[in-house]
Amino acid sequence: MNEAAVEIRGLDFAYESGRPALRAVDLTIRRGECLGLLGPNGAGKSTLLLHLNGVLRGRGQVRVLGMETKRVHLKEIRRRVGLLFQDPRQQLFLPTIEEDVAFGPLNAGWSGEEAHRRVARVLERFGLEPIAATSPLRLSTGEQKRAALATVLVLEPELLAFDEPSAGLDPAGRRDFIEIVRALSQTKVIATHDMELAYELCGRIVVMDHGRIVADGPRDAILGDAGLLSAHRLERPLSMVLREMTLRDA
């Protein structure tokens, strides 16, 4: 089996305005890996995520789970790649949470019985059963985030791509979400400004700026390089700094 979940070679992409968003991106992500994608606003992080399931298609080669992101493969890729948007309301558009979660299985061609079984299981897993009949508009941001993740995980994808998953969450909601993501065994790509989240969850860090990958390496090496991070408008995680101070003073 190919050990690479994602293989990207020479990827360039520009929006209709002509502004380049990705420039000569080369990236391999191994199966089972949790990769943190960091960078300032406009670095190209979200644009790169949207290439993983063919929402955007630039020049170059993108292979996901052994398939090129060409039209012939897009249905299968989108079934096996789950993308969680920064704003959960982009994924919650039906009258109730239960209907939103059921939308994917029913449109994937599964029987009503199989879809119901999967929906019930994922609602229970994320503690959404008590609010299953509730409109997404009446939920807190944390509940909306969990519901949006449920709409993705009900399809049992092999690769998960998160765009700013902690945005808008209060401390308790953020902690709950981190623990949910930590428990997931799938290959994960997390685009975020939340340095603490990246430090907690990701074993490998990629830094992007101006559409290019400017650094790629083990978590501690990248997040420990204050000069590198400062050059790209990022900061070291405070918990990492405090841990080093504690060890130094011990």
Predicted regions and their residues:
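Conserved ABC ATPase signature
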Residues: S135-L139, E143
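ABC ATPase nucleotide-binding domains
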Residues: G224-A250
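Conserved ABC transporter NBD signature motif
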Residues: G60-T69, I77
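H-loop/switch region of ABC-family ATPase nucleotide-binding domains
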Residues: T192-H193
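Helix-to-loop junction immediately C-terminal to a conserved catalytic motif
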Residues: N53
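The feature captures the beta-strand-to-loop junction immediately N-terminal to the Walker
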Residues: L38-P40
